[in-house]
């Protein structure tokens, strides 16, 4: 069994302050029309490196997606560009999921710049669910880094992750926005062990994951279905190496859709890892851009059927820059199509 690059990867320790010219810089581009109902979140602070220059989790990941989406004028015109929450709102949201020891550990062990980077990803996730839950947008995509679904409460980076963005967003949806049942769909190539761990005994959050069980962190099995009040609200579907669009879409139709029907979510979140795409440097699946488009349509149809279309997608993995950008572009197009199909 090969040792995966995510194992033992050490983050940089960066203590330098973030330049005011970088922090919070608004993305450029034409204003979105009033009809735009899909939110778009990115931030110049995602240019802060978390690892050495040769590391696959690099600032170029978000830049590649930004460039691909902004180059498509028709798609860019369908998006509402919004800004992340900051400061006390992020502090409060982190405290709902992460221990004080973990939060202090990230800042002390990895430095102020990396902590700012990770908090910006959280702030974008919070603003996205806020915009969908309260401000009238139907759905949103958050082009953020670093990823988050491996983060637990270890006080350090795990699998390139510092804070669990999707878990923090989930608790914000519940505790601040007042939605009770949240469905998390994780299609990253790697199992989201952090997300599973944080909600394993929580019946208000349904965690659905497809992944390669032989890859880092080797934690997900079909036998793990939740415990206590959360029994039955974790559903893991390991896929074999080389898994295709048809493989994952069959799982979605036969397992995800019926599970969502039973759970009846009030809000849907996606851990959108694009390292399952063919040609990824860390993955061994063969999903295509069309596969991601179809997967998005399935998840968006669940959101439309159960919760008025409310869906927020957060970037997780994806390390072949060209493939990442192309798959994310297909995903965002499908989100805008789903949003425009929803009645006002």
List PLM regions with ranges.
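HDAC/HDAC-like amidohydrolase catalytic core signature
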Residues: 4-15, 22-344
């Amino acid at each position: 069994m090969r040792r995966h690059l995510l194992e033992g990867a050490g983050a940089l320790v960066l203590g330098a302050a973030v330049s005011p010219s970088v922090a919070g810089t608004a993305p450029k581009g034409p204003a979105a029309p009033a009809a735009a109902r899909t939110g778009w979140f990115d931030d110049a602070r995602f240019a802060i490196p978390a690892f050495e220059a040769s590391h696959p989790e690099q600032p170029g990941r978000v830049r590649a997606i930004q460039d691909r989406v902004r180059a498509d004028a028709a798609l860019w015109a369908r998006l509402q560009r919004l800004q992340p929450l900051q400061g006390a709102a992020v502090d409060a949201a982190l405290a709902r999921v992460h221990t004080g020891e973990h939060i202090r550990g990230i800042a002390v062990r990895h430095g102020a710049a990396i902590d700012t980077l990770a908090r910006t990803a959280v702030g974008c996730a919070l603003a996205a669910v806020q915009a969908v839950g309260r401000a009238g947008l139907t759905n949103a995509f958050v082009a953020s880094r670093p990823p988050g679904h491996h983060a637990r409460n270890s006080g350090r980076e795990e699998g390139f992750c510092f804070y669990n963005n999707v878990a923090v967003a989930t608790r914000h949806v519940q505790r601040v926005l007042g939605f009770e049942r949240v469905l998390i769909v994780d299609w990253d190539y790697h199992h989201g062990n952090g997300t599973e761990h944080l909600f394993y005994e929580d019946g208000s959050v349904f965690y659905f994951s497809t992944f390669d069980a032989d890859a880092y962190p080797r934690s997900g099995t079909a036998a793990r279905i939740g415990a206590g009040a959360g029994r039955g609200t974790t559903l893991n579907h390991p896929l074999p190496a080389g898994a295709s669009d048809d493989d994952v879409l069959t799982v979605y139709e036969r397992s995800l859709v019926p599970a969502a029907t039973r759970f009846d979510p009030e809000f849907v979140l996606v851990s959108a890892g694009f390292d399952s795409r063919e040609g990824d440097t860390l993955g061994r699946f063969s999903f295509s851009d069309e596969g991601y488009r179809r997967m998005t349509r399935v998840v968006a149809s669940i959101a439309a059927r159960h919760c008025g279309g409310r869906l927020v997608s957060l970037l997780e993995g994806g390390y072949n820059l060209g493939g990442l950008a192309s798959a994310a572009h297909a995903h965002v197009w499908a989100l805008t199509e789903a949003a425009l199909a929803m009645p006002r």
